[in-house]
Every structure is written in structure tokens, then in C-alpha cells.
From Swiss-Prot:
Major location category of this protein: cytoplasm
Ranges annotated as spanning the membrane: none
Subunit record text: Interacts with translational regulator CsrA and flagellin(s).
Species of origin: Carboxydothermus hydrogenoformans (strain ATCC BAA-161 / DSM 6008 / Z-2901)
Record key words, sorted: Bacterial flagellum biogenesis, Chaperone, Cytoplasm, Translation regulation
Function: Acts as an anti-CsrA protein, binds CsrA and prevents it from repressing translation of its target genes, one of which is flagellin. Binds to flagellin and participates in the assembly of the flagellum.
A Gene Ontology cellular-component term: cytoplasm
One of the GO biological process terms: bacterial-type flagellum assembly
Organism superkingdom: Bacteria
Record localization: Cytoplasm
Protein family (similarity comment): Belongs to the FliW family.
Annotated protein name in UniProt: Flagellar assembly factor FliW
Pfam families for this protein: FliW
């Protein structure tokens, strides 16, 4: 197992092992040139993660586990999408959603239409556009997020 060390302007010196590195064969929309990302959890039991571009660590995304906030949100992948991610019934999967927190905002915006799905076994991931009628911009009050995050640490 190798250890990756990189410096990110937002996070400082980061040390991570290879289990936290994911390949994005097509990159992310708008960042197709970036193929390798580091996925780190904000802190234990936090619903937040950071997805940091290895080749350009100044580029990162904030992601969240939507199930921690929205009980009725479910990611259903088509057979084609499952194939692109090399998924089977037994494959461990993590589905996260990109969030945007505008400066001085009282709410954050979650993209529910296009989750980032991680194949935890093969270490590949893709942002998938769901067929379901979920919004691209779903607002959630930051107070609700803080309440749920605090509940997860107890």
C-alpha cells in the first residue's frame, strides 16, 4: 500500500492511502481532464466528504451523503450505468451528491439529479444523471444540516 502526500491550498498538507483514490474515466462535467481524485471524509460520522483532484489539488468538491438528510432519496442506476461502474449485486457502493454553499448563505444547494457513485471495490467513480425526477438545485437550510451532522457524532 502506498501513501499519497499532496498539498491543497484549501486543506494544507494531506496524507492519504491508496484506498481513498478513485479513478474517474471521463472526469467530471467541466473537468474532463482530471481523472484521479482523493475522497476524504470531513470527520468521523460527518455526512460531508471532500473530493480533491490529485493533479490539481486546488480543485475540490464538497459532497454529502443525502440519505442522512433526505429519507426518501434513492439512487437507482440503469443496467448501462451499472455496467459503466462495473457493479454487481455484491459490489460495495457509495453514492454522494455535490453540494454548493454560497458565501453567507443560510442554506446549501444539493444536486440530487446527478449523484457521484463510487465503486468501492474497483476504485472507480462517475457522476451519473438519474432518470428519476430529482432537482439539480435542492435547497436545504444549513440549520437542518448542522442538526443532522451533530446527531451523527453522538
Amino acid at each position: 500500500m502506498f501513501i499519497l502526500r499532496l498539498f491543497s491550498p484549501a486543506f494544507g498538507e494531506i496524507e492519504a492511502d491508496e484506498s481513498q483514490i478513485f479513478s474517474f474515466p471521463e472526469g467530471l462535467p467541466g473537468f474532463s481532464h482530471l481523472k484521479k481524485f482523493l475522497l476524504i471524509r470531513h470527520r468521523d460520522n460527518s455526512p460531508f466528504f471532500f473530493l480533491i483532484a490529485i493533479d490539481e489539488p486546488e480543485i475540490y468538491f464538497i459532497l454529502i451523503e443525502p440519505s442522512r438528510l433526505l429519507a426518501d432519496y434513492h439512487v437507482e442506476l440503469s443496467c448501462e450505468q451499472q455496467g459503466l461502474l462495473h457493479l454487481s449485486e455484491e459490489t460495495p457502493v457509495l453514492s454522494l451528491n455535490i453540494v454548493r454553499i454560497p458565501p453567507e448563505a443560510k442554506e446549501m444547494i444539493i444536486n440530487l439529479k446527478a449523484p457521484v457513485v463510487f465503486n468501492l471495490q474497483e476504485k472507480i467513480a462517475r457522476q451519473i444523471i438519474l432518470d428519476a425526477d430529482y432537482p439539480v438545485r435542492y435547497p436545504i437550510p444549513l440549520s437542518k444540516v448542522k442538526e443532522k451532522a451533530d446527531a451523527g457524532t453522538k
